Amino acid sequence: MEEFQRYLELDRSQQHYFLYPLIFQEYIYALAHNHGLTRSILLENSGYDNKSSLLIVKRLITRLYQQNHLIVSANDSNQNQFFGCNKNLYYQMISEGFAVILEIPFSIQLMSSLERKGIVKSHNLRSIHSIFPFLEDPFSHLNSALDILIPYPVHLEILVQTLRYRVKDVSSLHLLRLFLYEDPNSNNLITPKKAGSSFSKTNQRFFFFLYNSHVCEYESIFVFLRNQSSHLRSTSFGDLLERIYFYGKIEYLVEVLAKAFQANLWLFKDPFMHYVRYQGKSILASKGTSFLMNKWKYYFVNFWQCYFYLWSKPGRVYINQLSNHSLDLLGYLSSVRLNPSMVRSQMLEKAFIIDNAMKKFDAIVPIIPLIGSLAKAKFCNVLGHPISKAFWTDLSDSDIIDRFGRICRSLSHYHSGSSQKKSLYRIKYILRLSCARTLARKHKSTVRAFLKRLGSELLQEFFTSEEQILSLTFPRVSYTSRRLYRRRIWYLDIICINDFANHE
């Protein structure tokens, strides 16, 4: 117990983060809007436009704190004017900068943690595809998995309390409360329509930060208890998740379970346990029996309710057998399938045929949901029959072909880890014929005429495969690249899920 108490010692030197003065620094808003920097696909903003000057920010915060400007009627909640502009525009502008400021202490601690562990290329860990190699080898030896829907906080104040001991100055916390209670999109953090994907695109950075800090709160204690019960310590869990606010809860757990600590931690001693989180969900896979998985199920429900005030129910945690169930994971259908093989053995004059079945992690493209996404975007109907893209008929021919080609290459790149890439040919066919129908509609001609006129160009644009990309990247090993193309390839440059692959 003394070892646990030493681990729970508060590091007072890390509590003194005074972030409020940074709100008035103009370069913070330039960073938030990626002004002068490379734009991020995930955090794409409308532009800087000199709207974040120091004078405007000071005046705006002063006006926001005045009570008469915080009382907004239901009829003009979206049209309340500050300085002749829309109120929500200013909330968005400052909250984006505020999100950058809140990330500073966590980023500093994360970088120091990665340096201690000797992880040089930490940006590779941001890739969505890095999840699949983590699962590929262990899942072939596991039996069951918990498919968990992560509960959301029941009150916005819980989000503020999560950051209370990390962000020391009270002014920053008051401003955070102001953003949460005044922003109409903040309700998505409590009652989301779609788990992890319902945040407004105008303020994603702010809400993603709050959501991740909320989820990491319980994950930090979960991994701490797991590490104390196993000699095989977790190496992929960074110090970023160890918030000062969590220590009080951990101390309470240690105090309650002091007399029978080891007896209560038997559940964590499964050496074959793997946990991964994505899109408001998490997966806990284990080699344990159905009885053990049911114990895990009720443990999570009680853990959330008793210690983190998160209402949940057993129906949000599903127990699935990996041998006969596929996991809908980041645009892939992942499962563990049996790969049968036959071995002929010769002993003296007798021959034996031995049937052997090996488990293999498999990830395929869910073709039906993908066609549904294309139908929603008006590239085809619900049956997968290509239709013209009417909104693009005002563009030039080269722009139309380029747009369809980029979508096709993006899908091929994202689904490069699929073991059945031939299913992507149907998607390429839909996009190619939709492009031809769009061009034919623009020029008031027939599809046959355009396919005859631009057939070779369309083929070159839509069937640039990953094999060709690999041969350009590794020109001296073209044969090896062709072999690699037939296998799964996980890339380390994919930081957000493809829009068409997001079926949540």
From Swiss-Prot:
InterPro entries: Domain_X (IPR024937), Maturase_MatK (IPR002866), Maturase_MatK_N (IPR024942). The keyword Iron-sulfur does not apply. Coiled coil: none annotated. Its main location: plastid. GO terms for molecular function: RNA binding. The keyword Cell inner membrane does not apply. Pfam families: Intron_maturas2, MatK_N. GO terms for cellular component: chloroplast. It is found in: Plastid, Chloroplast. Usually encoded in the trnK tRNA gene intron. Probably assists in splicing its own and other chloroplast group II introns. Belongs to the intron maturase 2 family. MatK subfamily. This is Maturase K.
